[in-house]
Amino acid sequence: MTTPAFPDLVPALAAALPELRGKLTANAPIADVTWFRVGGPAQVLFQPADEADLAYALAHLPAEIPVTVIGLGSNLIVRDGGVPGMVIRLGRGFTDIAVDGTTIVAGAGVPDVKVARAAADAGLAGLAFLRGIPGAIGGALRMNGGAYGGETKDALMSARAVDRAGRIHILSLDDMGFTYRHSAAPEDFIFTQATFRGTPGEVAEIQAEMERITSSREATQPIKSRTGGSTFKNPPGHKAWQLVDAAGCRGLVLGRAQVSEMHTNFLINLGCATAAEIEGLGEEVRRRVLETSGVTLEWEIKRIGLPA
């Protein structure tokens, strides 16, 4: 599918942001940074050099330009028409990890699994659950990411964020307002760093727990397919996959998108699906689940951009 290009904003932004150190790219393809491998371009992709560069950009970016943040692209559908405005992706300047006693400080661009490994290597228990989340720390902060009995709220001490005006904030655990797959932090906050606290433990036991999580994921989830991870949040008192299965949606196909046969809360790109097919399949699943069980499933996957 050919997506029309957006107007090129880079020359105007470069003029408005003369001290910018990060990279601006016009009409940047971003499908390949998502796990589904679908979607149109970012009107402008900005990869900030570090937190100060991000704050500078946001402080001087014209207010009428919308801002969207993406991480590793694991829990994300980019629609086929692309994403207008500025898409921010945190790269190398946000990938440091430091361990000090029982404390781990990690940039928002660090994959969750790397934090789990750093904790295990340091003999710190309580963060192994991050091994089961296929995303980055920024996403875990935004949605209280969790898996295998643990959630971000269980280990977080504090977080750093930059708001749309370029102001830097330090948020305590209470400030984050965590609930199931949700943070009450303002929507315009872009997380840049997290500080976690672990509990001293035995390295071998922690590593064994991580291996159990890895084995469980491989046995029960289609992790080798083009998928976005868990599609729907678990409604109170229910498991989303059970509701999807009971609605007869296991293996359901729309175009080149499919509900996984292995785990019904996963959607799969069979090879050359469009974002519209994947999202449309998810909506059909929601319709059937509502019809059969009376439960309205809420998307866990983030969907951004415009239809083609």
From Swiss-Prot:
<keyword id="KW-0132">Cell division</keyword>
<dbReference type="GO" id="GO:0005829">
    <property type="term" value="C:cytosol"/>
</dbReference>
<dbReference type="GO" id="GO:0071555">
    <property type="term" value="P:cell wall organization"/>
</dbReference>
<protein>
    <recommendedName>
        <fullName>UDP-N-acetylenolpyruvoylglucosamine reductase</fullName>
        <ecNumber>1.3.1.98</ecNumber>
    </recommendedName>
</protein>
<feature type="active site">
    <location>
        <position position="300"/>
    </location>
</feature>
<keyword id="KW-0560">Oxidoreductase</keyword>
<dbReference type="Pfam" id="PF02873">
    <property type="entry name" value="MurB_C"/>
</dbReference>
<comment type="function">
    <text>Cell wall formation.</text>
</comment>
<comment type="similarity">
    <text>Belongs to the MurB family.</text>
</comment>
<keyword id="KW-0961">Cell wall biogenesis/degradation</keyword>
<keyword id="KW-0285">Flavoprotein</keyword>
<dbReference type="InterPro" id="IPR016169">
    <property type="entry name" value="FAD-bd_PCMH_sub2"/>
</dbReference>
<dbReference type="InterPro" id="IPR016167">
    <property type="entry name" value="FAD-bd_PCMH_sub1"/>
</dbReference>
<feature type="active site" description="Proton donor">
    <location>
        <position position="230"/>
    </location>
</feature>
<keyword id="KW-0131">Cell cycle</keyword>
<dbReference type="InterPro" id="IPR011601">
    <property type="entry name" value="MurB_C"/>
</dbReference>
<dbReference type="InterPro" id="IPR006094">
    <property type="entry name" value="Oxid_FAD_bind_N"/>
</dbReference>
<comment type="pathway">
    <text>Cell wall biogenesis; peptidoglycan biosynthesis.</text>
</comment>
<dbReference type="GO" id="GO:0051301">
    <property type="term" value="P:cell division"/>
</dbReference>
<keyword id="KW-0963">Cytoplasm</keyword>
<dbReference type="Pfam" id="PF01565">
    <property type="entry name" value="FAD_binding_4"/>
</dbReference>
<feature type="compositionally biased region" description="Polar residues">
    <location>
        <begin position="216"/>
        <end position="233"/>
    </location>
</feature>
<feature type="active site">
    <location>
        <position position="181"/>
    </location>
</feature>
<feature type="domain" description="FAD-binding PCMH-type">
    <location>
        <begin position="37"/>
        <end position="201"/>
    </location>
</feature>
<dbReference type="GO" id="GO:0009252">
    <property type="term" value="P:peptidoglycan biosynthetic process"/>
</dbReference>
<dbReference type="InterPro" id="IPR036318">
    <property type="entry name" value="FAD-bd_PCMH-like_sf"/>
</dbReference>
<feature type="region of interest" description="Disordered">
    <location>
        <begin position="216"/>
        <end position="236"/>
    </location>
</feature>
<dbReference type="GO" id="GO:0008360">
    <property type="term" value="P:regulation of cell shape"/>
</dbReference>
<dbReference type="InterPro" id="IPR016166">
    <property type="entry name" value="FAD-bd_PCMH"/>
</dbReference>
<keyword id="KW-0274">FAD</keyword>
<keyword id="KW-0521">NADP</keyword>
<dbReference type="GO" id="GO:0071949">
    <property type="term" value="F:FAD binding"/>
</dbReference>
<keyword id="KW-0573">Peptidoglycan synthesis</keyword>
<dbReference type="InterPro" id="IPR036635">
    <property type="entry name" value="MurB_C_sf"/>
</dbReference>
<keyword id="KW-0133">Cell shape</keyword>
<dbReference type="InterPro" id="IPR003170">
    <property type="entry name" value="MurB"/>
</dbReference>
<dbReference type="GO" id="GO:0008762">
    <property type="term" value="F:UDP-N-acetylmuramate dehydrogenase activity"/>
</dbReference>
